[in-house]
Structure formats: structure tokens, C-alpha cells
């Protein structure tokens, strides 16, 4: 649940975030509570397939967050690593939600695979668009510049770093 509030943003899609209302510690506890409540419901209802999807999603998001932290320290991220990170973080979460929806209505395995793949593509597109918002207008409901301040390596930043000279890179990194 901490990954959902990791950027400490006060707004989400134009609304106040849980973090803004309750601060980090309470936001993390509320997230942990909701996650454990959902997992217990899966156990009570013998929805082990759904429990497996949730567990795998949390694992993927954690791996993605750790990779992002590691790479941000060194600023040695390329497009391939960027896509690995967003697939493990945002895309795996959206993909998992789509998969759970399909599993919960007893879809065929081919339908589950298709909707899971669609969710992965939606998650990738969502994250790229979210990264672009960091550089956009104020009217979008997300504060600008947070990713840069937190040294998040985003696709626009990767493209910029690949297309500027060394002195410009040094200036940008400072």
C-alpha cells in the first residue's frame, strides 16, 4: 500500500489524496488494512485464484519499485529498464484488476489471458501519459514537477538525457 502513496502527492486526478488528508503513516495503514481485508475475503470465499493474482501483483509492484529506486540513484536507466519498471508497477496493477474481473465471472482461460494483456497495455499507456502530465499544464489535476523533484526517471526524461550534451546533462541532473 505504501507504493500507492510513494510520491506523496497531495492530489490525485484533481482530488485530495489519502496522503493529503491523513498523512503517510495512516495512509499506509489504511492501505494495508484494505489489502489484508481483501485477501481474507478471498480465503473465506475460497477464491484462491484471485488471491494468487493479488499476491503476484504485490510481488511485481515491489520488484518494480525496488528496481526504480536502484536505477534512480545511478541515473542509469534506459528505455528497456523503464518499460520493465512500469510493467511491474502500474501495468501489473491494472492488468491484475482486469484479470480478477475476468476470473470472478468464470471467463475461459483464453478470455482471461486476453483481458490480462489488454490491462497490461492500458497500464503502460496510463503510466506514459501520467509521466507526460509532469511536464504539462496545471489544469490536469496533478501537480507538475513532482517526478523530477523525486528523481523519478520517466520516459520524457530518458529521451531528453539521450538527446543533450554532457554539460546540459550535468545542469539537468543538479
Model regions and ranges:
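A mobile "lid/hinge" subdomain adjacent to the ATP/sugar-phosphate binding pocket shared
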Residues: 170-174
Amino acid at each position: 500500500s505504501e507504493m500507492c502513496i510513494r510520491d506523496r502527492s497531495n492530489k490525485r486526478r484533481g482530488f485530495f489524496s489519502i496522503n493529503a488528508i491523513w498523512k503517510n503513516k495512516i495512509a499506509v495503514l489504511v492501505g494495508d488494512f484494505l489489502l489484508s481485508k481483501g485477501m481474507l475475503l478471498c480465503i473465506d470465499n475460497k477464491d484462491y485464484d484471485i488471491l494468487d493474482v493479488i499476491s503476484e501483483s504485490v510481488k511485481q509492484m515491489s520488484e518494480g519499485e525496488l528496481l526504480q529506486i536502484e536505477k534512480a540513484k545511478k541515473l542509469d536507466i534506459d528505455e528497456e529498464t523503464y518499460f520493465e519498471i512500469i510493467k511491474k508497477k502500474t501495468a501489473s496493477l491494472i492488468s491484475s484488476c482486469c484479470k480478477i474481473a475476468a476470473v470472478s465471472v468464470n471467463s475461459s482461460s483464453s478470455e482471461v489471458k486476453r483481458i490480462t494483456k489488454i490491462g497490461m497495455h492500458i497500464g503502460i499507456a496510463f503510466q506514459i501519459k501520467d509521466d507526460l502530465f509532469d511536464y504539462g499544464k496545471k489544469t490536469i489535476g496533478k501537480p507538475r514537477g513532482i517526478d523530477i523533484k523525486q528523481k523519478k526517471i520517466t520516459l520524457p526524461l530518458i529521451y531528453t538525457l539521450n538527446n543533450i550534451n554532457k554539460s546540459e546533462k550535468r545542469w539537468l541532473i543538479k
